[in-house]
Amino acid sequence: MRKNAIVMGASSGMGREVALLLLADGWQVGVAARRADALEQLRKQYPEQVTVAVIDVTDETAGEQLTALAERMGGMDLYFHASGIGKQNPNVDAEIELLTVGTNGMGFTRMIDAAFGYMAKHGGGHIAAITSVAGTKGLGMAPSYSATKAFQNIYLQALEQLANMRKLNISFTDIRPGFVATALLDDEHHYPMLMNVQTTARLIMKAVKAKKHVAIVDWRYRVLIALWRRVPRCIWRHLPIKTKD
C-alpha cells in the first residue's frame, strides 16, 4: 500500500535524515525546504519516490503550498515538521528573537495548521514535529528559542485534544531531542551530551512508527528533564544553565 509523507525542512539536518529513512522504508516523500539544490539531490537519488517543493515556512502562502504538494502527491499520510532555527542570545538582540519567533512560532503554526486542515478533510493522518527539550524550562541563554519550543509543545497538545473532540483520525507525535550535531548548533560552543544525527533520526523514526504522543530523545535527556521538572522556579532562576565556551 502506497504511503505518502511530507518532510518540511528536508534540505539538511534531522529533516534530511528522516526523509532518507522514510525513503529507505519505501515511502513516497515530498521534500520541502528553502534550498532547492539540496532537495534536487534527494530527487536525483530517489527519482521514483521524491517530489520536491521549495517552501519557506515564513511565507504567508506556505500553508497553501503544503496543501498543493499533498494534492500533487495524491495524499499525505504523515506530515513531519523539522523546520526551525535557534541561537544563543544572552544580549537579547531583538532581531534574533523576532526571527526565531517568526520561524518557530508563526511558521510552525502556519504549517501544522495546514497539515491539520488537510488531514481533517481527507480522513486523517499523522502529524509529527521536532520540538526540543528546551521547551521544558525557560533558558536564559536562548529566551525566544526555549519559549517557542514550549509553545510548540502546548500547541501540539491542544490540537491533539481538538482532534479527539472532533473525532478526527489524526495522530500526533511531539519529538523533543536534546543537543544534536547539526548545522543548527554553532561551532563556537561546546554542547554537553551531543547526539549523532543518524542515531537520533533512527530513534525519532522508532517513535513515529510507534505513534508515541511525546518522545524525549534520548534516555539521558529523559533523566535530565525529569530532574529539571522538579526544580522550583525560585531555584531555577539562579541556575547558570548554559553551554560551555
Predicted regions located by residue number:
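Residue(s) in the substrate-gating loop at a strand-loop-helix junction
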Residues: S132
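Short alpha-helical oligomerization interface
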Residues: N89-G102
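Conserved glycine-rich cofactor-binding loop
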Residues: S11-S12
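Conserved NAD(P)H cofactor-binding loop of Rossmann-fold oxidoreductase domains
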Residues: F80-Q88
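Rossmann-fold cofactor-recognition segment
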Residues: Y46-T61
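Active-site helix of classical SDR
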Residues: I112, T148
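C-terminal helical subdomain
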Residues: D174, H189-I225
